[in-house]
Amino acid sequence: MRYILNNNVEGTSALLGSTVATAFLQPFDFLKIRLQGSGFASGGDLNKFKRVGVIDTCKNVLKNEGIKQFWRGSSPTIVASGIAWGTYMHFYEAYKNILKSKYNVTQLNTFDHFICAVGASATQVFITNPIFLIKTRMQLQTPGSANYYTGIFDGIKKTVKVEGFKGLYKGVIPSLWLTFHGGIQMSSYEHIKFYFSSNSGKSLDSLNASEIFIASSISKFLASTILYPFQVVKTRLQDERNIPNQNNVRVYNGTKDVIFKILKNEGIIGFYRGLVPNTLKVIPNTSITLLLYEEIKKSFNYIINE
């Protein structure tokens, strides 16, 4: 047990913290995905563009699909988030240790943290993209949708059958752009933590819950706001409805086409669809995840060193 924990403290701590946080905040993730994927009417008719907001989306879901729909895709969301955070933090700490050993230092600077975070994010993308793709499609589908997914494995099976193995990696390019999200978030998080530590005289491991909450909230807000448009582009590419419709016309043909059509039909604001529910979800989610991560990591380290 101690051997396993000693080699997976960060990954296991992040996985557990993310699982708890994601389960409580699932409805906000559902709304974010619905709003990011909105813009064109069902069937991909470019002449039926319409704008929808948070309130209208909530009303439509409650009226036509029921309250349970807010938790549709919760299983893949929880699984995806847990694996993503666990994988990310495991490799983030691993890359940090590599640089510390290379430079023979105990504390890395902000740029080093940025590089480690981007590297960890890229590694995590290739491992988890198929799961996030199925999660996204399950949240965008409605009862009666073509190729309706009943679960993660059913979604993977149908995706491979219809689109081939490469279909599981739709949206991977904008996902790789989003590796800078992890870079901005974690370098900011580490910098703010170091600021609190320097001004209070406490060690980084001794920071209290409020300091961790502030550091995680600010860092997540910065990263999310700056790079949010890439999330919208990724969601549009992954949306199952963007496969040829009944008229055999594709809504989007690649990343450049998505960007062009969003600008043409929705304007700049189209790149920020779902930002409000996303902010309401990701900031508390990240704060809770990192709070639990830090506390669980302390507990695991105590067990290992006991």
Curated annotation (Swiss-Prot):
GO terms for molecular function: FAD transmembrane transporter activity; folic acid transmembrane transporter activity. GO terms for cellular component: mitochondrial inner membrane; mitochondrion. Solcar repeats lie at residues 5-98, 108-195, 207-299. Gene3D superfamilies: Mitochondrial carrier domain. Keywords: Membrane, Mitochondrion, Mitochondrion inner membrane, Repeat, Transmembrane, Transmembrane helix, Transport. Belongs to the mitochondrial carrier (TC 2.A.29) family. This is Mitochondrial substrate carrier family protein M. It comes from Dictyostelium discoideum (Social amoeba).
